[in-house]
């Protein structure tokens, strides 16, 4: 956690680990729907979202009950806005409506090696895996919220809400959240099951028969090719499922191919 001083000048701890909580657990909001049209607004008439920094978002039913001063401090729910899961059913979304996404620490890790030799031909393969964990794709959140300035965005932006795409998967796209709707807050749409199986190393070598080696005046000659970090089987949207908790600051593990010749004279 962090040590901070409250208004009374007392030193307190904020954040950090919670006693009795599972280590590595991740919590976030759960997006359950999108306002598809003006008519659809009535389905969320009593919806209230207190999390946007520019003011609470109100469904049209609640909005109609507010005074002019209260409306000036808030926002009216609009088509394209995300709808988040209300955990306790009080029609108000706040920090207590975050739900468990999973654990960022793999529950199971392991690997397997395979080695086969046949008539001078050798095959070696090494696979490893991690399963039972989730990872936060914070880069996806950053780009989907259009916080990257003039840089390009993701292909998912083609599946964001608009009047022409009312059934899109993602909320309305808005440059740098200029209307402070907070539709792209950290939620389930930015968490993936990052379980993976990796072909960590595959090596193939061939030792020429001695009679062939003698043709080129050698006692033994072995040629080989080795590939490392070749590919992943995974459902993760991260560049690499081994990034860790949120994918920030990570760089993909390089895929390498090595060729070798071993000669004995």
Residue ranges and their predicted role:
Residues 8-41, 160-167, 184, 230-265:
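C-terminal beta-signal and terminal closure region of outer-membrane beta-barrel proteins
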Residues 120-124, 211-212:
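Repeated loop/turn-to-beta-strand initiation elements of outer-membrane beta-barrel proteins
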Residues 125, 223-225, 261:
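Membrane-embedded beta-strand positions of outer-membrane beta-barrel proteins
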Residues 1-102:
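Conserved small-residue
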Residues 48-50, 54-56, 64, 68-70, ...:
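Extracytoplasmic gating/loop element in the C-terminal half of outer-membrane beta-barrel translocons
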Residues 118-120, 129-133, 201, 208, ...:
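Transmembrane beta-strands of outer-membrane beta-barrel pores
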Residues 111-113, 201-205, 258-260:
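Membrane-embedded beta-strand positions in outer-membrane beta-barrel channels/transporters
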Residues 108-110, 119-121, 195, 217-221, ...:
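Outer-envelope beta-barrel architecture signal
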